[in-house]
Regions:
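An N-terminal, well-structured beta->alpha segment
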Residues: 1-58, 62-64, 127, 137
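Generic alpha-helical secondary structure signal
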Residues: 21, 76, 116-120
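Gly/Ser/Thr-enriched, mixed-charge loops and adjacent short helices
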Residues: 104-137
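Residue-level signal for pocket-adjacent positions within structured domains
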Residues: 5, 9, 99-102, 109, ...
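Ferredoxin-reductase
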Residues: 31-109
Length: 137
């Protein structure tokens, strides 16, 4: 089982490993883990960030999360919003990595990245594929 998370989120080459499907499944995992809570989501200006952003939002909504969309924003702004609004966070950014890379930084309600224990729990859900989808009945 490959470790997904690094120091702060995941970073991968877009459309090699970090595909819309990968982002969707990772968002299912995070959405399942936080049990339908609210998530504030933002992205950076990379061309492919919008694709990953849309996949993450879709995955969170499928698991019953409420989503606040910030769109194009800076990571510190999203961190502030998480603290201010008491929400979880997801930032689509590769920070300083080369242009072909992108990443997803999940945040706690404090605006800080997930701690190791939370990373491990999200990874377990990701690899087990035991997602909690909301019923639309």
């Amino acid at each position: 089982m490959e470790k997904l998370f690094g120091t702060f989120g995941i970073r991968r080459v877009v459309n090699e490993i970090l595909t819309p499907d990968f982002a969707l499944k990772l968002a299912y995992s995070f959405g399942t883990y936080i049990n339908q809570e609210t998530v504030t989501v933002g992205r950076d200006a990379r061309k492919h960030s919008e694709m990953i952003y849309d996949a993450v939002i879709s995955g969170l909504l499928a698991c019953g999360c409420q989503v606040i969309e910030l769109g194009l924003t800076a990571t510190p702004t999203l961190q502030w919003a998480c603290r201010q609004w008491n929400t979880w966070g997801a930032m689509i950014t590769a920070s300083h990595n080369p242009p072909q890379w992108n990443g997803i930084k999940f945040m706690e309600k404090t605006g800080k990245g997930l701690d190791h224990e939370n990373d491990v729990e999200v990874e377990k859900i990701f690899y087990s594929e035991k997602y909690d989808f909301v019923s639309w009945k």
